[in-house]
A protein has these predicted regions:
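RNase H-like nuclease fold core
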Residues: 1-45, 49, 57
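RNase H catalytic domain
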Residues: 11-15, 55-132
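Short, low-complexity, polar/charged sequence segments that are solvent-exposed and flexible
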Residues: 24-27, 84-87, 135-136
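Glycine-enriched catalytic-core subsegment of oxygenase/oxidase enzymes
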Residues: 52
Length: 136
C-alpha cells in the first residue's frame, strides 16, 4: 500500500523552543488522518518525535513517502540510519549519537516499510500551518 506522511512545524528554527507541529497521513482513495500538537525541542528533535508518532499509526508493511522540511532528518533516515543501527547508534568516536533513543525507535518503526523521502514544503504545508495556528 502506497501512503504519505506530511510533517509540518510552526517554525524551522534549529534552536530548542516551544513549537507547534502537525502531520497528515494520506492513504489510497483519498483517506487522510491528521493530528496537531505542541512541544518543546529542537527542529530535528521535534521532527523525529512526530515522525515516530505518525509511523506508529501503521500496522501493515507499506510503501511510505515522508514529506518534511527537515532535510537533515530525512537524509539521515535514508542514508545513515542503517550504519548507526549496525554501530549500536554510536558515531565514529564511539559516542552515542544525539537523539539516540529516538533514532532507535525510528529504526524499529521503519523496518517493515519501504521508505522514500521528499524534503521541503508539500501540499499540506499551508493547511497544517493554519490548523496549528487554530490549535486543532
Amino acid at each position: 500500500m502506497e501512503t504519505g506522511i506530511y510533517i509540518e512545524l510552526s517554525e524551522n528554527d534549529p534552536r530548542e523552543k516551544n513549537r507547534s507541529w502537525g502531520y497528515v497521513l494520506e492513504a489510497p482513495g483519498g483517506w487522510t488522518k491528521h493530528e496537531t500538537g505542541e512541544c518543546t525541542g529542537t527542529m530535528h528533535g521535534v521532527t523525529l518525535q512526530i515522525l515516530i508518532k505518525a509511523l506508529g499509526r501503521y500496522h501493515k508493511p507499506s510503501q511510505i513517502t515522508i514529506h518534511a522540511a527537515d532535510e537533515w532528518i530525512l537524509n539521515m533516515l535514508q542514508n545513515q540510519l542503517p550504519a548507526w543501527e549496525q554501530n549500536g547508534f554510536r558515531n565514529a568516536h564511539g559516542e552515542a549519537i544525539k537523539y539516540q533513543q529516538e533514532w532507535e525507535q525510528l529504526a524499529e518503526k521503519v523496518k517493515d516499510h519501504k521508505i522514500t523521502i521528499a524534503p521541503g514544503r508539500h501540499e499540506y504545508s499551508a493547511w497544517l500551518q493554519d490548523e496549528m495556528k487554530r490549535g486543532r
